[in-house]
């Protein structure tokens, strides 16, 4: 029946055909037929009513509202059309318009439904006192017999939502749980319960409720293709159907992704997004689009920025979008763009940025032009947060003394949240001096924060880095690098390659060569095991360790050994040559060439020959490897032919020939 026009339908069959299409959820085709029919009979009540229904089911709420508005004008005595119009406007997030239409309804039989709608509008607008007042009216029975009572499932859900928005997550959980017990399994209520658990940092029960939603969704609706995309199966979009909405699968997978991301299980987070029922990109909801942008930012930053910028133009957009876009601009050092977005969207600043986040972003933007002023701003923010941390530490101690477990849990959660705000402020302060290569001052900043941060992995890692960079504190650096590596020793490739490399160098510089060799054997063994499962996978850990060690020897003037180590580290080239590894290798070669041109070193012909052969291999294997990763929002892109390892290796080879006077 695809593409069927009204002229092809036999006389007397039109209504039956339309109802069959609606029965089969083929709303788009029904819309085509009804729209054509209404051009001939624009005042057909039945046609407009069915068209409005189809638009509503297709989630084209503004179009549905327009149809219901026409119907209410044609039939003012039928107030249900005005109610439907208000509901469609609410669904379209046109809250002032929905409120205006709802106020026109004075039929007592619609009173409780209007109250529910008005409460939902106020809740969506963020007017929680107004929403609570209307919900309490409903619960008290003032709205008539069908308004429910205190133990009515709808009432419990409404109260749960209000408690959630007010930050009372434990109480919200109780309401949602009671609603499920009263009504039986409801996907949307189960999702609400999972969300409240997540917000209360109870990740295990949240994941349990999510797993239940997913399991039931798969069992009851196998046609939704859950997990197909992750498995690499090419499937068509399932669309934004009512069935998909009713299963709460999209919401569940998004929440699962958020939890895994919070737990730093980034692969699992990405998998949760690809596991959800397949839809075309233009069909994605704002939350999924936002999460895709965030979780693929490292691999596809340009795409991520485009998605977040697009979302900011939509109404509504996830409330985190504004802050996340600004933070990412600062992370990628697009401070001018961050300043422009803040200036152009002052109305969003007060709505979506906390005072802490605004002050932090303001300091970060100031860093670009006035680092001293930025440091003072960050210091003020750090002082405020350290006061809060001390107060919360005292609260925890007092609560433990009084054996008040509930207060302990609440204070510990608040402490953790405050610490997560403090760490970025501290790191931003440290980065100002790091950029000036004033490592002693960076160390001093970190030492001031030891009271709160000594157990925090990010703090420990950065302390290790600053000790390492001072070149006379390798032993102290080992004390910070070692616990990080040992914590992940059974999965050593999950540790950053530069951490492993710096630890190896620190061992070598403190004459602990056996420890360095043992660590390198461990890395090599894990890389070999990984290669058995996926022979074509590029793994750079051991390569980068060897490159950093080679760089160390080059820096000490031992180019014979250093360059040889660098060259051997990149074998086999098809598995070890990449943008990052080339970066380390070319630095050593540039240093070598600089010293050769100054005649401060002399290399044996055999070493020079080895260098030339190495660069020729890089020329062969580096054709499709970018020499540098370009910034995602650069307007002027590098020439694609020049931004390759092949091009740069030819340049280096030409420089070698020029310096040593060989004929090419």
Swiss-Prot record:
Cellular component terms per the entry's GO annotation: axonemal microtubule; intraciliary transport particle B
Pfam families recorded for this chain? TPR_16 (PF13432)
Query: Keyword Coiled coil: yes or no?
Result: yes
Q: Where in the cell is it found?
A: Cell projection, Cilium
Q: Name one GO molecular function term.
A: intraciliary transport particle B binding
Protein origin, superkingdom = Eukaryota
Describe the protein's quaternary organization and the partners it interacts with. Answer: Interacts wit the IFT B complex component IFT52.
Q: What is this protein called?
A: Intraflagellar transport protein 70A2
């Amino acid at each position: 029946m695809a593409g069927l026009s009204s002229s092809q339908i036999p006389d007397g069959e039109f209504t039956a055909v339309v109802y069959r299409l609606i029965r089969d959820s083929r709303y788009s085709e029904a819309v085509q037929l009804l729209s054509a029919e209404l051009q001939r009979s624009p005042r057909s009540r039945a046609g407009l009513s069915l068209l409005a229904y189809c638009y509503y089911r297709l989630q084209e709420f503004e179009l549905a509202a327009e149809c219901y508005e026409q119907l209410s004008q044609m039939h003012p005595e039928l107030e249900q059309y005005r109610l439907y119009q208000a509901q469609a406007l609410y669904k379209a997030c046109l809250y002032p318009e929905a409120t205006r239409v709802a106020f026109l309804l004075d039929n007592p039989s619609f009173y409780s439904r209007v109250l529910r709608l008005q409460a939902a509008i106020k809740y969506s607008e963020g007017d929680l006192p107004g929403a609570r007042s209307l919900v309490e009216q409903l619960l008290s029975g003032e709205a008539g017999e069908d308004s429910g009572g205190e133990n009515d499932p709808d009432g419990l859900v409404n109260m749960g939502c209000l408690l959630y928005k007010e930050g009372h997550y434990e109480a919200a959980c109780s309401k949602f749980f009671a609603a499920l017990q009263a009504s039986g399994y409801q996907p949307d209520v189960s999702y609400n319960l999972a969300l409240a658990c997540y917000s209360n940092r109870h990740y295990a029960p949240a994941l349990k409720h999510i797993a239940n939603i997913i399991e039931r969704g798969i069992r009851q609706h196998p046609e939704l293709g859950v997990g197909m995309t992750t498995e690499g199966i090419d499937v068509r979009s399932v669309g934004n159907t009512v069935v998909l909405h009713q299963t709460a699968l999209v919401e569940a997978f998004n929440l699962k992704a958020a939890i895994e991301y919070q737990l730093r299980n980034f692969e699992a987070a990405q998998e949760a997004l690809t596991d959800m029922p397949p839809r075309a990109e233009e069909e994605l909801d704002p939350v999924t689009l936002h999460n895709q942008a965030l979780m693929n930012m490292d691999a596809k930053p340009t795409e991520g920025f485009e998605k977040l910028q697009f979302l900011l133009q939509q109404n509504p957009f996830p409330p985190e979008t504004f802050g996340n876009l600004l933070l990412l601009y600062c992370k990628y050092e697009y401070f001018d763009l961050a300043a422009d977005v803040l200036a152009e969207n002052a109305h969003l600043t007060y709505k979506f940025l906390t005072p802490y986040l605004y002050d932090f972003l303001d300091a970060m933007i100031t860093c670009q032009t006035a680092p001293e002023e930025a440091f003072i701003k960050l210091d003020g923010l750090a002082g405020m947060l350290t006061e809060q941390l001390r107060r919360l530490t005292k609260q925890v101690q007092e609560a433990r003394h009084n054996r008040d477990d509930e207060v302990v849990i609440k204070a510990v959660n608040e402490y953790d949240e405050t610490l997560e705000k403090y760490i970025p402020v501290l790191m931003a302060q440290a980065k100002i001096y790091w950029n000036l290569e004033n490592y002693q001052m960076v160390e001093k900043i970190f030492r001031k924060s030891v009271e709160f941060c000594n157990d925090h992995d990010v703090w420990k890692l950065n302390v290790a880095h600053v000790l390492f960079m001072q070149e006379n504190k390798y032993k102290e650096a080992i004390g910070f690098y070692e616990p990080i590596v040992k914590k992940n020793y059974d999965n050593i490739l999950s540790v950053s390659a530069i951490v492993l490399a710096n630890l190896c160098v620190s061992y070598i510089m403190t004459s602990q060569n056996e420890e360095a060799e043992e660590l390198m054997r461990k890395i090599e063994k894990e890389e070999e095991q990984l290669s058995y499962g996926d022979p074509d996978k590029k793994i750079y850990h051991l390569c980068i360790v060897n490159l950093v060690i080679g760089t160390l020897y080059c820096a000490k003037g031992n180019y014979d050994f250093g360059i040889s180590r660098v060259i051997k580290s990149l074998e086999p080239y098809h598995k070890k040559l990449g943008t990052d590894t080339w970066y380390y290798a070319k630095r050593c070669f540039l240093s070598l060439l600089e010293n050769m041109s100054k005649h401060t070193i002399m290399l044996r012909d055999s070493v020079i020959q080895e260098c030339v052969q190495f660069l020729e291999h890089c020329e062969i294997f580096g054709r499709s490897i970018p020499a540098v990763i370009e910034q995602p929002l650069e307007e002027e892109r590098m020439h694609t032919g020049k931004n390759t390892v092949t091009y740069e290796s030819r340049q280096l080879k030409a420089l070698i020939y020029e310096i040593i006077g060989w004929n090419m």
